[in-house]
Structure formats: structure tokens, C-alpha cells
Design a protein with these regions (language model features):
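Helix-loop-helix hairpins and the membrane-proximal interhelical loops
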Residues: 1-47, 161-162, 194-285, 428-430
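Helix-loop-helix junctions within the multi-pass membrane cores of secondary transporters/permeases
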Residues: 2-34, 55, 75-85, 89-137, ...
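Transmembrane alpha-helix interface/packing and boundary motifs in multi-pass membrane proteins
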Residues: 59-71, 182-187, 252-260, 291-301, ...
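Membrane-embedded alpha-helical modules
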Residues: 91-205, 209, 327-435
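Conserved, well-structured core segments that form the ligand-binding/active-site neighborhood
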Residues: 70, 200, 204, 319
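Internal alpha-helical transmembrane segments of multi-pass membrane proteins, especially GPCRs
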Residues: 50, 100-103, 251, 289, ...
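Loop-to-helix transition at the N-terminal end of transmembrane alpha-helices
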Residues: 42-61
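Residue-level signature of catalytic and energy-coupling elements of molecular machines
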Residues: 17, 37, 121, 190, ...
Length: 435
């Protein structure tokens, strides 16, 4: 396997196979969970199951071959939630137009990925703001998980309140959350999918959900959602008039995907010391290039933006050091295409607990934030709080970047207001102008 330079990376096929399997086990939950989230955009669930598996296969294998890094890729949960609840339900966009937005943001990412733009972003944007973005998205998707399980419900006086805990479906969600946290805390490999399966079995036994009539079948067609991108609805309103109202949304998808990828890869590097030399940094650059291409491809397949998955760290810790690990992970996902009846039978309240714990894990990056600095403290707080409260990643980003720039200006800390911050503040203003 000279292509992957196994000897140079002090690994072998057996180790890479085991690492790929480990990564697959830790992230298999993404197939039913992402399909469930995107189904709220009125997209067919069966096609979404297949499309999620297919883009995971293609993006992971492509990264393994292009970048030779053990980083698996799949659809990002934060942007999937924003796609369904922010664009389709919130802005009343057809899902075809939302896919067009995903494609345009992916195209921007591809163009800029082969320039020095990424390194410029890493230098110009404070690490604390990148952490705030990750934590804000974590709070956003955790809130969605609690909302969809009806653990948190609407209230006329207080906007939100606790749900009806006498409802067995709500209790099932609570059990799922406790079980998922317990298994993850015990560091059991595959804790997410194990918790989903146990909670599902409990739901089937208690007749809270129908038992699967079959476990295996041929893959569902993705034709209802593939190649369904609509660009006209992005730049022209219902009356046919030209509009730029959705430009900030396109930029939001791009910026969020960029930060998500950088944060994930930085996290893997922090956990495993994987990107600590010049050669590895070159591989990191190529991984970001693969991520950009995959993001564009995801819209074509019919799902939201792809990103590098932090679960790849489990494979790296298992010994994975080359792209062969990512290739094996992608190939393992082929199996999920033939398990669609089983995946369809999993009740939503067995899946959404995973969304809550993923949100918690994303939120944990705040431990490195310098809260002694007022600009950092306020911008972090507003980013994290405003994403779930406004039900919008774009609004959260805008509040965070604007507050950071304004406070640094008041503090006369002009060195902190670099070109990157100025551009992001201008973009943030446009978020409110083009509402």
C-alpha cells in the first residue's frame, strides 16, 4: 500500500482497518439522525437515509485518497438543523432553493480553499470567537433535540417550559439522554449507536413505536432529492424581483462550515498531536480542500453541507494514521445502505438524545475562552445565547462578531480589529439589513 505510505506513518493495513471500523461505529448514528433532521424540510426520509450514507461514503473515501488523512466526513448536524428549521421552516424557502444555497456556499468554499484564504482566516479570527461559534451551534442543536422530544415545549407566557413528563414518549427521550450520557461517560466505543439501539428496543417492547417488519432491503433511490437544486428562488422573490436578501445566509453556511472544519481538525490535532509538523500541516490543507469539494457535492446528492467529523479522533486514537482509515470508514458505510428498514424503524425520541450530547460536546470548547477580556466575554455570550434564542446560526454569528468589533473599538484596541474582523462585521451588518 505504497500509495498511503503506511511504513512512513508507522502503521499497517490491519491497524488502519481497525481504526476505520472504530470511526464507523462512533459515527454511524449520523445516518438516521441527519435524515430525521432534514425530513423536517419536507424531504422524503427514505431518500435522505440513502443520500446521507452516500455522501458519507464519497466524502470520506475522497478525503482518504486526496489528503491521505484518517479524517471521515459526513453531513454537519448544525447546518442540517439550520437548513430545516431556519431556512425551510423559518424563511419558508423551498428545500430545493435551500439546496441551491448549500451549493453556492460550497462553491465559494472550493474557490477559496485553493488560495491562502484559509490560513488568513486562521490568523485573523481570534480562537475564542471560533470556540464561541462551535459552542453556539452546540447550544442550538441541543435545544432542537430537547424541543423535538417535547422535553421543552412552547408556552404563551414564558415562551418555553417543561413538557408533559407523564407522556411515555417524553420519558423515553429522557431515558435516552441519561443512557447516552452514561455510556459516553464510561468511554464505551460506539456509545451513541448502542444507546440508540437500546432505547429503540425499549420503545418497541413498550409499543411506543412499531417494530421493524424487516431489517434489510435494497437501497432507496435518491432521485427525489438528487440534482434538485434551485438557484432562481435564491435571487428572485415570489414576484420575480431581484433580491440579495439571502446572500447573508449563503455566507453563513460558508463561514460556519469553515469554522466547523477548522475547529474539528484543530480538535483532532489537540487530542492526538496529529498535525504538529510541516508535512502533516500540508495534509491538513488538503483535508480542507477535500471538505470543500464534498460540501459542493452534498448539495448535488440532496443533503446539507458536509464537514470533517470529530469522531475521527477515535480512529486516530486506535492507531489510524493515513487516508486508508478514512477509506475503510467510507466503505463500512456501504452497509448502512442495505439496513434502511431498520434505520426507518428507529423512533425519533431514541435518536434525538444523541443530538443533545453532541451539543454538549460542542459546548465544552468554551473551557479555553478568555472570559477576563470584556470583548471576548460579551461576544462569546451573545453568540452562544442568540443562536438558540433566535433559532438562527446567522443571527448568533452576527451578534457575536459585531459585539466583538464594537467593544474592541471602544477599548481602542485597534490591533485586534484586523481586516478579517472588519469584513465579518460588515457581513454581520448585512445579516440585519437584508432581513
Amino acid at each position: 500500500m505504497g500509495f498511503f505510505k503506511l511504513k512512513e506513518h508507522n502503521t499497517n493495513i490491519t491497524t488502519e482497518f481497525r481504526a476505520g471500523l472504530t470511526t464507523f461505529i462512533t459515527m454511524i448514528y449520523i445516518v438516521p439522525l441527519n435524515a430525521l433532521i432534514l425530513s423536517h424540510a419536507n424531504m422524503p426520509y427514505e431518500a435522505l437515509l440513502s443520500a446521507t450514507a452516500i455522501i458519507t461514503i464519497l466524502s470520506s473515501v475522497f478525503n482518504g485518497l486526496w489528503a491521505n488523512t484518517p479524517i471521515a466526513m459526513s453531513v454537519g448536524l448544525g447546518l442540517s438543523a439550520y437548513f430545516s428549521f431556519g431556512l425551510v421552516q423559518g424563511l419558508k424557502l423551498p428545500w430545493q432553493s435551500a439546496l441551491g444555497i448549500v451549493a453556492l456556499s460550497g462553491a465559494i468554499f472550493v474557490i477559496l480553499s485553493f488560495t491562502k484564504f484559509r490560513s488568513w482566516v486562521m490568523r485573523s479570527i481570534p480562537s475564542d470567537l471560533r470556540r464561541a461559534v462551535s459552542a453556539g451551534i452546540g447550544a442550538f442543536i441541543a435545544f432542537i433535540g430537547l424541543k423535538e422530544m417535547h422535553i421543552v415545549v412552547t408556552h404563551k407566557a414564558t415562551l418555553v417550559t417543561l413538557g408533559d413528563f407523564s407522556d411515555p414518549h417524553v420519558l423515553l427521550g429522557v431515558v435516552g439522554i441519561v443512557l447516552t450520557f452514561a455510556l459516553y461517560t464510561l468511554k464505551i466505543k460506539g456509545s451513541f449507536i448502542i444507546a440508540v439501539l437500546i432505547t429503540s428496543i425499549l420503545a418497541w417492547v413498550l409499543k411506543l413505536a412499531p417494530y421493524p417488519s424487516e431489517f434489510f432491503s435494497m437501497p432507496a433511490s435518491i432521485s427525489p432529492i438528487a440534482f434538485q437544486l434551485d438557484f432562481k428562488g435564491i435571487f428572485f422573490d415570489a414576484s420575480g424581483a431581484f433580491t440579495l436578501a439571502l446572500v447573508p445566509v449563503i455566507i453563513t453556511f460558508f463561514v460556519t462550515d469553515l469554522f466547523d472544519s477548522l475547529g474539528t481538525l484543530a480538535g483532532i490535532g489537540h487530542k492526538t498531536d496529529f498535525f504538529n509538523d510541516e508535512e502533516k500541516n500540508k495534509e491538513l490543507e488538503r483535508t480542507l480542500e477535500a471538505d470543500a469539494v464534498a460540501s459542493l457535492g452534498s448539495a448535488v446528492v440532496g443533503v446539507s453541507t458536509t464537514t470533517a467529523f470529530i469522531e475521527s479522533a477515535s480512529g486516530v486514537e486506535e492507531g489510524g494514521r493515513t487516508g486508508l482509515t478514512a477509506v475503510f470508514t467510507g466503505l463500512f458505510f456501504v452497509l448502512t445502505l442495505f439496513c434502511l428498514p431498520l434505520l426507518k424503524a428507529i423512533p425519533s425520541n431514541a435518536i434525538y438524545p444523541v443530538l443533545v450530547i453532541v451539543g454538549v460536546l460542542m459546548f465544552s470548547v468554551l473551557e479555553g475562552v478568555n472570559f477576563k477580556d470584556m470583548a471576548t466575554s460579551v461576544s462569546t455570550f451573545l453568540t452562544v445565547v442568540m443562536m438558540p434564542l433566535t433559532f438562527s446560526i446567522a443571527d448568533g454569528l452576527a451578534f457575536g462578531f459585531l459585539s466583538y468589533g464594537i467593544i474592541k473599538l471602544v477599548q481602542k484596541d485597534f490591533k485586534a480589529i484586523n481586516s478579517g474582523i472588519i469584513i465579518l462585521c460588515i457581513i454581520s451588518v448585512s445579516v440585519f439589513i437584508f432581513r
